[in-house]
Regions:
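Hydrophobic core of transmembrane alpha-helices in multi-pass small-molecule transporters
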Residues: 11, 80, 90-108, 114, ...
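Juxtamembrane intracellular "pre-TM" segments in multi-pass secondary transporters
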Residues: 1, 173-219
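Intracellular juxtamembrane helix-capping segments at the cytosolic ends
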Residues: 105-120, 311-325
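Conserved MFS/SLC helix-loop-helix module at the cytosolic interface between two early adjacent transmembrane helices
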Residues: 51-88
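Helix-loop boundary and gating motifs at the non-cytosolic
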Residues: 1-46, 209-248
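Helix-to-loop junctions at the C-terminal end of transmembrane segments
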Residues: 51-65, 147-148, 258-271
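Symmetry-related core transmembrane helices of the 12-TM Major Facilitator Superfamily/SLC fold
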Residues: 140, 155-172
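Structural signature of the two symmetry-related core transmembrane helices
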Residues: 68-82, 274-289
């Protein structure tokens, strides 16, 4: 099968995500954290995405060693997540989340940069590659939801093991090639440093339209972060357990499949701004349905995951890959 490693890499990344993102706030709540503390802990990953993630992306682009950087991040995540078992106080959990976020925040953009580029080179529809991640996420989150009620720490051990497997799969990506800037710097010696630095400070994208695209992405991320941060806590307050959380997250993942099957047709028919406007509207409706506190309406809200998050994610990733300045693909995706 052409590009099998790309399907496996994307699938394994979303398996690692399924063993952390859906259940972590429920873990915080069970450890006695209040809403304010959960909000602080949940904000660390987005903060790392704004501050640390661009540094990792710049390192990957300037050296051209994206695969090596991704492998390093995976190994660091595998080690950092093992800090969680045994934590009890807010300070201990804060330290574990901070350490994990420093590395985890940069994994997806660099992984996407590599996988999307390879998919285009091999003539593979990225929607099909991403669908492998969706199915993997749905299967794992459903099974783990029923098991984690009595074995909560298993999510951390499983996450660590999956990051190690993810690392092995990343070794199947083509070997890193030094960027033209790095080659030029080696050829010309230390005096080329200032030239390279000036070149690195240039624009990341070829069009200013990216700012409008990023505005939509910001609105979507605002909603999705709020949703993911407090859904688990909300279910606990209503008297439900991890099993329902797993079912709801499985529904949301499966709702992405029809979108991925149709996204190329939709992209050809409608402009990016039209699709993103509809996606943000679906996210707003999703939050309204969730607030009802009714399981049936919660399930309906989860069915909007595909029309909201997946549309926004796919449009942004593919648009950025087209409009990013050559040599800055990791920074663009970050």
């Amino acid at each position: 099968m052409k590009g099998l490693n790309l399907y496996l890499i994307n699938g394994m990344y979303w398996i690692t995500a399924s063993l952390y993102l859906p259940f972590i706030t429920m873990y915080f709540s069970q450890k006695g954290m209040d809403s304010m503390q959960i909000g602080i802990l949940s904000a660390l990953l987005p903060i790392a995405s704004l501050t640390v993630q661009p540094l990792w992306a710049a390192l990957a682009d300037r050296t051209g060693r994206r695969r090596r950087v991704l492998i390093l991040l995976n190994l660091c995540c595998a080690a950092a997540v093992l800090l969680f078992p045994g934590t009890g106080s807010f300070g201990e959990i804060l330290g574990a989340v901070t350490c994990y976020a420093l590395f985890n925040s940069a994994v997806l953009p660099i992984c996407d940069a590599l996988v999307v580029s390879q998919a285009e080179e091999k003539g593979i529809n990225f929607a099909w590659v991403r669908m492998c991640g969706t199915v993997s996420y749905a299967a794992i989150v459903l099974g783990m939801g029923f098991y984690l009620k009595k074995h909560m720490n298993l999510m951390f051990y499983g996450n660590s093991a999956c990051f190690l497997l993810f690392t092995l799969l990343c070794l199947t990506l083509p070997k890193d090639k030094k960027t033209l800037k790095a080659q030029e710097q080696e050829r010309r010696g230390p005096e080329a440093d200032q030239t390279v630095k000036k070149a690195g400070k240039g624009p990341t994208f070829q069009s200013k339209e990216i700012y409008l695209i990023l505005l939509f992405a910001f609105a979507m991320q605002f909603g999705i972060n709020y949703y993911s941060a407090f859904l688990g806590v909300y279910l606990l307050e209503l008297g439900y357990s991890q099993s329902l959380l797993g079912v709801l997250n499985c529904i949301s993942a499966l709702s992405e499949i029809p979108v991925l099957l149709l996204i190329h047709r939709l992209s050809r028919r409608y402009k990016q701004t039209v699709l993103l406007t509809a996606a943000v509207g679906c996210m707003a409706l999703r939050l309204i349905l969730l607030s009802a506190g009714n399981v049936a309406l919660m399930a309906a809200a989860q069915l909007l995951q595909g029309p909201s998050y997946m549309v926004c994610y796919f449009v942004c990733v593919t648009y950025i890959n087209r409009m990013v300045v050559p040599g800055k693909i990791s920074q663009g995706q970050s």
